[in-house]
Amino acid sequence: MEGQVVGRVFRLFQRRLLQLRAGPPQDNSGEALKEPERAQEHSLPNFAGGQHFFEYLLVVSLKKKRSEDDYEPIITYQFPKRENLLRGQQEEEERLLKAIPLFCFPDGNEWASLTEYPRETFSFVLTNVDGSRKIGYCRRLLPAGPGPRLPKVYCIISCIGCFGLFSKILDEVEKRHQISMAVIYPFMQGLREAAFPAPGKTVTLKSFIPDSGTEFISLTRPLDSHLEHVDFSSLLHCLSFEQILQIFASAVLERKIIFLAEGLSTLSQCIHAAAALLYPFSWAHTYIPVVPESLLATVCCPTPFMVGVQMRFQQEVMDSPMEEVLLVNLCEGTFLMSVGDEKDILPPKLQDDILDSLGQGINELKTAEQINEHVSGPFVQFFVKIVGHYASYIKREANGQGHFQERSFCKALTSKTNRRFVKKFVKTQLFSLFIQEAEKSKNPPAGYFQQKILEYEEQKKQKKPREKTVK
């Protein structure tokens, strides 16, 4: 059974890779189903308030295979149970639910009962046939009880990227599961009926717990929603600013990047952080925060990918036929493999600007929000300086349809090194998808990136009179 599921998922993945060579849609090894009734944006963090928090809560446990010593992960609890689905919807749901256990236990099938196991919080991403993404928020731990036992995973499937919020929800699920599975149901039902809050807003849930009474649980969405799906702390802990900059440079040119780490939490947090550095652009290729053992062949793919692999599979990865890969050891803070030109991809002046900004006041930061803003800011500013003038080079027809003037856009940059870089960057899917959306919209989106563009243009206007006065 498991081999059939893995084979089906992998065939879907291979088919998606072939599609990628021909066009721009997103892909992922966890391509499990298509959901036609809900259209999603390319970038995970951009979700409006009013959506449901989640689609499923699942408990995934390890079950011993018949006549074998190995274990297989299976779903032992599901909320809600979907009924009255059309045949096509039912088939899609079945594919999704068969794929999820592989990502909850990506380590493989060799397990032994344990008396101690450090709890881990991690996430994975499943990409649908239509390019939209579902996120699995996971808490893996050893259930309460005497004697040796096997870990299990609580997994919340949602279309919303807000990791801090879902980590708190997993805390509440875990607390209730220690009492009884029956106590989880009313909490999750209340959560399912609540609308996901808009940025900066709070939703309060009323929940009863035996022996504790009624509790009120407040879930607040960060005001700055473009960073709510990420935590840069792990990336800063594992790597230097210079190394992060080289990873960013590789990602900007859509190369193959593999992260290695022992822990699932470290892997998923670091890969999400690396992808978030690309804002306002979205990684459009294979994206697997933690690769299941059965899908390790992903690292041999000829197309771009950004994946995380557990350290136990390091030798298998190293022995795989790979070309032009950046292989990052997060445990040691080293690059095990690289192309060799990572330091030369970005314009030197702009590289220095990023490093200077990252180094200023880093020790004074106290909260996760402050760290996120501090790390993300210099990379957003890089894109503002390099491509912030894009809207001026979209010419529109009478019907409002825009056409990007690529050549004039590149020529507008006065720096030769900036122009050289941009001529490469405009050929990426990162930029192509961004410009395609801009061509459809009559006005630039009033988001965080546009705000930074306007601030930068205002600074330039104020700088010109001062320069004339000095002369």
From Swiss-Prot:
It is found in: Cytoplasm. Residues 226-359 form the cDENN domain. Residues 361-445 form the dDENN domain. Residues 55-204 form the uDENN domain. Keywords: Cytoplasm, Guanine-nucleotide releasing factor. InterPro entries: cDENN_dom, dDENN_dom, DENN_C, DENN_domain_containing_2, Tripartite_DENN, uDENN_dom. GO terms for molecular function: guanyl-nucleotide exchange factor activity. One of its GO terms (cellular component) is cytosol. The keyword Cytoplasm applies. In bronchial mucosa, mainly expressed in ciliated and basal epithelial cells and weakly in alveolar cells (at protein level). Tends to be down-regulated in lung cancers, immortalized bronchial epithelial cell lines and precancerous lesions. PANTHER family: DENN DOMAIN-CONTAINING PROTEIN 2, DENN DOMAIN-CONTAINING PROTEIN 2D. Guanine nucleotide exchange factor (GEF) which may activate RAB9A and RAB9B. Promotes the exchange of GDP to GTP, converting inactive GDP-bound Rab proteins into their active GTP-bound form. This is DENN domain-containing protein 2D. It comes from Homo sapiens. The lineage of its organism: Eukaryota, Metazoa, Chordata, Craniata, Vertebrata. The gene is DENND2D.
